């Protein structure tokens, strides 16, 4: 009869291990170590109230790396905190009629418990939430410094404005041009906003990517494209009104000055000063500008919207031909990008061509390929787009360009640049797609921007001795406006410069501000200043882990803020993280039923019975509650919208944390998508039960004697060889390859080999002890609770396994005395032979010929030759 001790009971095992870790403060670290430091960090979670499988995968990857690094002799920091400000708390406050702070802190309590149940080796003494004043006070300090240095400034910018709720909406809150809650048509409104001059660091951010050798190439490519460095000319176009009066000149940046003779009109943004000037005397234009203020500001929406425009009646003077070009307002030109004006070359720009064809504007060809590959490349048509029209990588020459005919791109660029610079009408310029970071949010639940507005002194930074500016947490939040805007006691204050009446800034910071420097605060969480000398001990982060969806915004601001802290002499390093791992998504099947109106009701996989074919593919599905069919959707990322998420807590309760951890590491390599499959989870549970039984069965035969490698027979040596080969594989998988699935597979192979090792001698017991100890230690980074318990079962005192060294390879064990060779006859496998690794050729040939099955196939044949591939194959050629 199995006893409680030798039955695999995950809840008991995990509770015991976690109690030991907590009571010994096992994972709290400091800087006073003679070991090399290693800082492993997974992106901090938003406290939504419940972990999802994406969290589990992310934090398990980080935990595996952290525990492995500790076993290889490193002083490892793995902290945790909460990205606690943001929109979801406001939405929950509206829905549940509870203050955002109360909702947030309650969720943190719940999620902390969930994380602890998974057994992560986290230094909880460094925990903080970004909504705590003793965190964001340092962010406010930094902002006031940036104001004084001119790196923080205020200007007007467009936002999505809900006129009913009287609030600014994020792009994702604009649905079909309407506010998500009020349903009112959204307006584009220009309001004052605070910005950080990230563009001052554009080139450094670009150059720094070349030093990030251990960041994924796709992330670096996305950042390069987002920074968008381009070299071109800025050219001035004189502008005249209908009465031929000169107006302010238009500045246009172009990377294609070679197409200048193809310009047939100029496009400007609806907010451009010239558009506003023209609208004063043109009611139709004024009406269009008002319409263009409707709808959202997201790039996706702007790309897909119908192209619209109107002639302003103004004329731009072509800087070479002096031709009068119409100036059009176009809804695809944005004031925030470049100069808000574009020289339109419809013959060689697809967007301009579509616009010109819609409004009947002239289209001219000014480029021809020198060596067209086919008829399409020899043909230019004004109403058909072909990619070669705009491809400057091909060899082409200018045509229809007067004195510039025959020039290629580079020659035309140089000639025109020299001409305009000589005339004072243009200059070479490096431009960036990157725009300054708008950090103002017209929301309540965020860090208050530390600025005071005085009628006399203007915008004044809050003095450092008056920081933090604390956000009041006990408020009634309705979603209409912000509580701090309507709270005169909080809003009204005194100007720190003149002592006169003044008001506080009621905008709060973009939550990317908090998540751009949190990693540094973990290094010195109780420091009076933003950071102290401990930061330079731990930074940069050695391993950062998070989704590739953060490639542009978070990871760009993360790098930028690190440079701000460096320039403030808070850190010594240039980049915040050495290695970046972008884990794949967790995906799952989707099921649904269609409603009469065409909408879909998504059904959770846990509520569905499925039928599968012999290959395991789903062929049918029914709803458990009514037995009726449901439709099978695509396999997609787990999400609330598709209702295909799996609650990690249910899985932990059902199978145990180690089983969930093991499956999440075994099902796919870290960078690839993981398809959730409960049958796979059950398979991992079976493996852990089998390992548990193996260890307890072995331990029941008493302690092992000391291993004497000189006394081992061939089978025992082969078993040791398998053990140490496994160490070598797993060490490479953990350390270099980060291939945890193959590490697990290697341990499973070792377990299976050991199960077939049925020798019962004293030395075989010692060999088995070594193999089991090895498996327990190799699995410890992934299944730490089970390893903690089994280590004691194998006769060791309770200890922190991470403080034990990772198993060492005995190279003498890898030297096999015998080797197995496959024997082929005319290329077909007929048998195997076991020979000494140093056996002479004659011995190998004789053994191969006389192998019983091989000998049968050689009867009546003449052996022509024997080919030996050392260590692998013997091929006998006969006829």
Curated annotation (Swiss-Prot):
GO molecular function: aminoacyl-tRNA deacylase activity; ATP binding; leucine-tRNA ligase activity
GO CC terms, sorted: cytosol
Short sequence motif named 'KMSKS' region, residue ranges: 637-641
GO BP, one annotated term: leucyl-tRNA aminoacylation
Pfam families: Anticodon_1, tRNA-synt_1, tRNA-synt_1_2, tRNA-synt_1g
Entry's EC annotation: 6.1.1.4
Transmembrane segments: none
Localisation per UniProt entry: Cytoplasm
CDD domains xrefs: Anticodon_Ia_Leu_BEm, LeuRS_core
Record-linked InterPro entries: aa-tRNA-synth_I_CS (IPR001412), aa-tRNA-synth_Ia (IPR002300), Leu-tRNA-ligase (IPR002302), Leu_tRNA-synth_edit (IPR025709), M/V/L/I-tRNA-synth_anticd-bd (IPR013155), Methionyl/Leucyl_tRNA_Synth (IPR015413), Rossmann-like_a/b/a_fold (IPR014729), tRNAsynth_Ia_anticodon-bd (IPR009080)
This protein's UniProt keywords: Aminoacyl-tRNA synthetase, ATP-binding, Cytoplasm, Ligase, Nucleotide-binding, Protein biosynthesis
Catalytic activities: tRNA(Leu) + L-leucine + ATP = L-leucyl-tRNA(Leu) + AMP + diphosphate
Entries under PANTHER family matching the protein: LEUCINE--TRNA LIGASE, MITOCHONDRIAL (PTHR43740:SF2), LEUCYL-TRNA SYNTHETASE (PTHR43740)
The protein's name in its UniProt record: Leucine--tRNA ligase
Organism, scientific name: Xylella fastidiosa (strain 9a5c)
């Amino acid at each position: 009869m199995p006893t409680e001790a030798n039955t695999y009971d995950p809840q008991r095992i995990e509770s015991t291990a976690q109690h030991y870790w907590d009571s010994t403060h096992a994972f709290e670290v400091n800087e006073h170590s003679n070991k090399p430091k290693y800082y492993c960090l997974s992106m901090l979670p938003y406290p939504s109230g419940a972990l999802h499988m994406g969290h589990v995968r992310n934090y398990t990857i980080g935990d595996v790396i952290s525990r492995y690094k500790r076993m290889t002799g490193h002083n490892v920091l793995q902290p945790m905190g909460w990205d606690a400000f943001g929109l979801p708390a406001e939405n929950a406050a509206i829905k549940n009629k509870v203050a955002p702070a109360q909702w947030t802190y309650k969720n943190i309590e719940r999620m902390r418990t969930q994380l602890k149940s998974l057994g992560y080796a986290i230094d909880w003494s460094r925990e903080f939430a970004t909504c705590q004043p003793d965190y964001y006070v340092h962010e406010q300090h930094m902002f006031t410094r940036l104001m004084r240095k001119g790196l923080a400034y205020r200007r007007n910018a467009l936002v999505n404005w809900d006129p009913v709720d009287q609030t600014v909406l994020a792009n994702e809150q604009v649905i079909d041009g309407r506010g998500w809650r009020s349903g009112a048509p959204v307006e584009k409104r220009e309001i004052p906003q605070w910005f950080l001059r990230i563009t001052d660091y554009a080139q450094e951010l670009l150059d720094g990517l070349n030093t990030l050798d251990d960041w994924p190439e796709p992330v670096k490519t996305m950042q390069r494209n987002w920074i968008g460095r381009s070299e071109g000319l800025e050219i001035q176009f004189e502008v005249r009104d209908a009465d031929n009066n000169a107006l302010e000149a238009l500045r246009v940046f172009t990377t294609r000055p070679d197409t200048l003779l193809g310009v047939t009109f100029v496009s400007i943004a609806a907010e451009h000063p010239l558009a506003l000037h023209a609208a004063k005397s043109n009611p139709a234009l004024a009406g269009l500008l008002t319409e263009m203020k409707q709808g959202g500001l997201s790039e996706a929406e702007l790309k897909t919207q119908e192209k619209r425009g109107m002639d302003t009646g103004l004329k731009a003077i072509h800087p070479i031909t002096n031709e009068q070009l119409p100036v059009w307002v176009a809804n695809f030109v944005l004031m925030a990008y470049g100069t808000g004006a574009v020289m339109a070359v419809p013959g060689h720009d697809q967007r301009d061509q579509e616009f010109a064809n819609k409004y009947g504007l002239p289209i001219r060809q000014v480029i021809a390929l020198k060596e067209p590959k086919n008829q399409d490349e020899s043909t230019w048509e004004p109403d058909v787009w072909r990619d070669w029209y705009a491809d400057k990588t091909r060899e082409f020459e200018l045509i229809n360009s007067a004195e510039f005919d025959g020039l290629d791109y580079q020659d035309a660029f140089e000639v025109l640049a020299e001409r305009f610079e000589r005339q004072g009408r243009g200059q070479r310029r490096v431009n960036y797609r990157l725009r300054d970071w708008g950090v103002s949010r017209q929301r309540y639940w965020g860090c208050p921007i530390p600025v005071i507005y005085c009628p006399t002194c203007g915008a004044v930074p809050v003095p450092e001795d008056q920081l933090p500016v604390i956000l009041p947490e006990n408020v009634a939040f309705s979603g209409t406006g912000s509580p701090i805007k309507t709270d005169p006691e909080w809003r009204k204050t005194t100007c720190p410069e003149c002592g006169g009446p003044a008001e506080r800034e009621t905008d709060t910071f973009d939550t990317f501000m908090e998540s751009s420097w949190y990693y540094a605060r973990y290094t010195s969480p109780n420091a009076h200043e933003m950071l102290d000398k401990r930061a330079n001990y731990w930074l940069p982060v050695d391993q950062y882990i998070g989704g590739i969806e953060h490639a542009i915004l978070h990871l760009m601001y993360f790098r930028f803020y690190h440079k701000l802290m460096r320039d403030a002499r808070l850190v010594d390093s240039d980049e915040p993280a050495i290695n970046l791992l972008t884990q794949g998504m967790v995906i799952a099947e989707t099921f649904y039923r269609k409603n009469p109106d065409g909408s879909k009701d998504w059904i959770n996989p846990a509520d569905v019975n499925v039928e599968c074919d012999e290959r395991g593919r789903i062929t049918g599905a029914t709803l458990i509650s009514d037995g009726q069919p449901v439709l099978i959707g695509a396999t997609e990322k787990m999400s609330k919208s598709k209702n295909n998420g799996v609650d990690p807590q249910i899985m932990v309760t059902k199978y145990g944390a180690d089983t969930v951890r093991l499956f999440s590491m075994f099902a796919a390599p870290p960078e690839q998508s993981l398809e959730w499959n409960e049958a796979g989870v059950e398979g991992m549970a079976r493996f852990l039960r089998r390992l548990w039984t193996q260890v307890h069965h072995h331990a029941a035969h008493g302690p092992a004697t000391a291993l004497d490698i000189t006394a081992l027979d061939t089978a025992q040596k082969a078993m040791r060889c398998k053990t140490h080969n496994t160490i070598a594989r797993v060490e490479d998988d953990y350390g270099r390859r980060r291939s945890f699935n193959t590490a697990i597979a290697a341990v499973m192979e070792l377990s299976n080999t050991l199960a077939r090792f049925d020798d019962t001698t004293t030395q075989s017991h010692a060999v088995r002890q070594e193999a089991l100890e090895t498996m327990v230690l190799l699995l410890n980074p992934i299944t730490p609770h089970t390893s903690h318990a089994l280590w004691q079962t194998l006769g060791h005192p309770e200890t922190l396994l991470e403080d034990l060294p990772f198993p060492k390879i005995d190279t003498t064990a890898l030297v096999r005395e015998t080797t197995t060779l496959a024997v082929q006859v005319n290329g077909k496998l007929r048998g195997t032979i076991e020979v000494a690794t140093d056996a002479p050729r004659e011995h190998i040939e004789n053994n191969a010929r006389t192998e019983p099955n091989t000998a049968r196939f050689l009867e009546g044949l003449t052996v022509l030759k024997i080919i030996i591939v050392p260590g692998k194959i013997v091929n006998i050629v006969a006829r």
